[in-house]
Amino acid sequence: MSSLVCDCPHLESVGEVTKEELIKKSHGSCQDCRVRGPNLWACLENGCSYVGCGESHVDHSTLHSQDTKHCLTVNLTTLRVWCYTCSKEVFLDRKLSTQPTSAKLQDSHTQESKMSSSLTLKIPAAVVSENLDIELEEEDELKTRGLTGLKNIGNTCYMNAALQALSNCPPLTHYFLDCGGLARTDKKPALCKSYQKLMSDIWHKNRPGFVIPTNLFQGIKSVNPTFRGYSQQDAQEFLRCLMDVLHEELKEQIVEVEEDAQTGIVEENLDEDKSQSDNDFHSCDSGSSSDHAESESRKLSEELTESTMLIHEDQKDVESCKTWQKEKKFSNNLNQNHFLQDFEKNIQSTIEESECLKQETVKVQIQSKAADFTAEVNMNDLPTSQTPLLNEGATTHLSSSPPKPGAVWTGHKKVPGLCPAKKRKQKKYHSVIADIFDGTIVSSVQCLTCDRVSVTLETFQDLSLPIPGKEDLAKLHSSSHQSSLVKAGSCGEAYAPQGWIAFFLEYFKSWFWGPTVTLQDCLAAFFARDELKGDNMYSCEKCKKLRNGVKFCKVQKFPEILCIHLKRFRHELMFSTKIGTHVSFPLEGLDLQPFLAKDSPSQIVTYDLLSVICHHGTASSGHYIAYCRNNLNNLWYEFDDQSVTEVSEATVQNAEAYVLFYRKASEEAQKERRRVSCLLNIMEPSLLQFYISRQWLNKFKTFAEPGPISNNDFLCIHGGVPPRKASFIEDLVVMLPQNIWDYLYSRYGGGPAVNHLYVCYTCQTEMEKIEKRRKMELETFIRLNKAFQEEESPAVIYCISMQWFREWEGFVKSKDSDPPGPIDNTKIAAAKCGHITLRQGADSGQISEETWLFLQSIYGGGPEITLRQNVTLAESEGGHAEEKIDVETRNI
């Protein structure tokens, strides 16, 4: 940063410019491509009024400088000045410092923080009004945005319909349009970049008639071979694949630390919160049964060590951040003894118990209608002094992905300074996908023999609902069934208001014209109490036998956008069929209160329809279209590939829905945004300016329930800016005047409050140390492995788990930020005649004794598995997965 102290000789060419003029220009657009801000650049050459876009678009500002030889340009979002000729940042106030300044300028300089050797940021408070009011002020100007078709590039109607449905989900689209600087990834195929470009094209002011989503389609095909070729694909499967990839590319580690020792113990027992989005997305019917041969605790311990990498936290850092982690906790924590007493009274209180699980940040993947559950509780033996749910605790991970080895070998050496032996924790992630689409369901099963209740918290991204037939509808609508459901605390309330007259009218109508199926019917069928008997008996962990049971579930947390998938396709062994039953659905006011768990933190349970994907044709062939409500003019449009046509609400309601997107409806959220806009208009000068997360600000603009303010997406655990984010910090934050910050903080809580940005020296030092460690380990391994490759007949060969080695390789190649845990050979080891040998077909590699001792001295772990010269050939090869690790370890 030393170059910043040097004056730029080109400052003399700057014309007379005022802050008000720059702010006025920031509301404009690029003079060449008409793209709007943020991050437009204005030329400062005397007499030149050019405004152009930056690198996030076509970079017309740079082209203008090259054509005109104008040197200086100013970013209209941050008011930072760049000289193209000097290739450095310069400061206008250096040029003006010798001139007398007015009181107004002095006040302005007082309000703005100075740039020092550590990073500080200049963001004018007036820009915030543009960031907050885009939906309110620009509605008339932008009313034609979003009506762009997508060209069919080879039987891709399924993709086009899905993309149009997502495009008309304001929280997601505004993220990519307003927070484009957050869409950063080093992962291939960088689908988030392709999606961001596509959204920019679709919602451009000067939109074309249609665009061709070639880049995004190529990216999807590269990660999922299912979508290669030209056969018909499923729009719902495409949605899951796309959002899963977007999550993986955009996910950020959540900065979480222990509040105290007791909390730390509980978190060690419970493991860390992990969004379902960290794995493949699954709907609520995508679970599978588990094998009960092993104990629940063993399965859980293996799952707790799964996934990306294990994080290693410094205890001092943990203690230093206790206070602002407390601010992040929701204020709805319940007293455990209170709901243990309620739990003994009726089955419904098991949902309250699951709330305790939620507060300990336990999230698991969904398994609908499966007979495997966690957190077993005996209703007759519940003590009041503890919570068995927390002690048993656990999470269940159900995925179609192959199981990953994860158990940590604990018998390793401790090497101070290199690999502390304390228990490592899983990383916790979130992304814009998880923030918008993730919800939570509480599933409970009661054994009718011993009264033990099993409770599971399950995270879902979409609800896959069955379409009930005539007999199912009769059962759902029957008065007797209503009573049993209401008593059981299930979803019978959805039908409770229906009287006998209405019931008979509905019955006779269905007799002549067939049953009328509503979306509420599908929801009621999904959440209805399920009797587990006959071939579907419940395997009780306490009884150790198959028993009759009762299962029911409710929603603990509703997502901001609820994706509902109607199961229209049935795939049999030899053929597939499609259910063509019309399902009526509301355009506004979908009330989900009957399906909400007791004491759920969700305040808003009413949803309005955003978009619906429809399929015309049969199970083997057909065509997808989408009906979407434009958020700017509230009109409905049909998106049929590159054709976009306005339609009536009646046309939408008569559609054969396949996938529906509902958004939380909240007048209060709109009032809050208007209040903040009014505060901006009456803004008073303040001595302090506060920085707020641009990502949270997007939630405030588009979410019905934005939740507490979270500034941790641009801060490290020490309260500074992580070095890797320093170069683009202006994309992560917005500056607020004090009165706006005070209002938002008092209304939503959270934090921490930030009025000064600086690069964290501690993180910088740690980063330099970790780079030295990477270099040392990598160079040593290459040297030792090269000697091993040159050795003709080694006396002993050591085996190492390739799963662990890949994690280590990712660390030394800087693909992963944290080192792996202890060496874990448990998955490749087998006991034979009292000795540990290599398991047949194990995913293992071969290394020399020196290499093993080197890695083991740093990371510890085991067990030690060796191959000697006197073993048989078959035993030494160990299976197809064994390999000698190449010296270059995949082109280092």
Curated annotation (Swiss-Prot):
Domain USP: 148-665
GO cellular component, as recorded: centrosome; perinuclear region of cytoplasm
Domain DUSP: 667-760, 768-871
Catalytic residues, chain numbering: C157 (nucleophile), H623 (proton acceptor)
Compartments it resides in: Cytoplasm, Perinuclear region; Cytoplasm, Cytoskeleton, Microtubule organizing center, Centrosome
Binding site for Zn(2+) 3: C43, C48, H64, H70
GO biological process, one term: endocytosis
Domain of life: Eukaryota
SMART domains registered for this protein in UniProt: DUSP, ZnF_UBP
Enzyme Commission numbers on file: 3.4.19.12
A Pfam family of this chain: zf-UBP
Family affiliation: Belongs to the peptidase C19 family. USP20/USP33 subfamily.
Protein name as annotated: Ubiquitin carboxyl-terminal hydrolase 33
Provenance organism: Xenopus tropicalis (Western clawed frog)
Gene name for this UniProt entry: usp33
